[in-house]
């Protein structure tokens, strides 16, 4: 469960509620914990890790990685590209220190094409994601690309595009993320996705439009769960 539903207030109370509801872990949007996560002190990091573990939970990982940093753009300029990669590496290090195992890269507004051709940005991204994956290997975490529909993003707008990107980068620590809301938006065939890219799926978000309760808008969550069982996703 993500801390986005709770915000940055009363984290201890939220952790207690999750445990009462038989949840195993929490996934953090780090900028809701600290205004600038990468500037958090070692004491603050240790305190947060102890708070999560003492609640009987584990940190699954991070998402909404660049939510508070619209200035960081992967494809705008070479300087911005380098700054973005450096910042993401700092988040990878932070996630690892807190005991997390994966980082989900959605951040649609940080992967705008800025008038560049898609193929040019795609080619650039191979080196960028390989760079991040190699650092993730050192830190024992995974970096997962989150495909987003065309209504949200300009880069990697389907599970098929995400799967092909992961295969091209070809590193065990660069993996594919699946969000049920995106599958509903792109109207992709889940049977095809699972058959072709199921071995690449590292992480799944169960969500619905506008943060509504899963299943309240789209009714295909049960069918998607059947496909996930097919690839033994846990």
Predicted regions mapped to residue ranges:
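Gly/Pro-rich active-site loop or hairpin
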Residues: 8, 15, 37-39, 74-79, ...
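Hydrophobic faces of well-ordered beta-strands that scaffold small-molecule active sites
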Residues: 1-3, 24-28, 59-64, 103-105, ...
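Active-site acidic/histidine proton-transfer and metal-coordination neighborhood
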Residues: 12-13, 53-54, 71-176, 185
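Active-site-proximal loop/turn and secondary-structure-junction residues that shape catalytic pockets
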Residues: 5-7, 30-32, 65-68, 109-111, ...
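N-terminal pre-domain/capping segments
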Residues: 1-100, 171, 187
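Hydrophobic pocket-lining residues that define ligand/cofactor binding sites across diverse proteins
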Residues: 18, 95, 136, 228-231
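Well-ordered, non-membrane alpha-helical segments in soluble/globular domains
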Residues: 45, 125, 221-224
């Amino acid at each position: 469960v993500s801390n986005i539903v709770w915000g940055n207030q009363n984290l201890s109370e939220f952790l207690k509620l999750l445990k009462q509801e038989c949840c195993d872990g929490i996934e953090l949007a780090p900028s809701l914990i600290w205004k600038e996560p990468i500037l958090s002190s070692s004491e603050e990091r240790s305190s947060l890790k102890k708070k999560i573990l003492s609640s009987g939970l584990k940190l699954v990982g991070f998402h909404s990685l660049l939510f508070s940093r619209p200035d960081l753009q992967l494809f705008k300029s070479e300087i911005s590209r380098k700054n973005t990669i450096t910042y993401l590496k700092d988040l990878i290090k932070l996630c690892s220190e807190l005991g997390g195992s994966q980082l989900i890269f959605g951040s649609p507004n940080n992967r705008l094409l800025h008038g560049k051709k898609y193929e040019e940005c795609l080619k650039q991204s191979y080196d960028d994601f390989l760079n991040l994956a190699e650092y993730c290997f050192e830190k024992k975490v995974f970096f997962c690309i989150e495909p987003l529909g065309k209504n949200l993003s300009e880069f990697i707008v389907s599970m098929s595009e995400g799967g092909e990107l992961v295969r091209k980068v070809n590193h065990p620590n660069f993996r594919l993320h699946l969000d049920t809301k995106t599958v509903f938006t792109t109207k992709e065939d889940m049977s095809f996705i699972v058959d072709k890219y199921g071995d690449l799926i590292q992480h799944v978000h169960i969500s619905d439009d506008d943060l509504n309760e899963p299943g309240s808008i789209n009714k295909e969550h049960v069918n998607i769960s059947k496909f996930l069982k097919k690839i033994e996703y846990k």
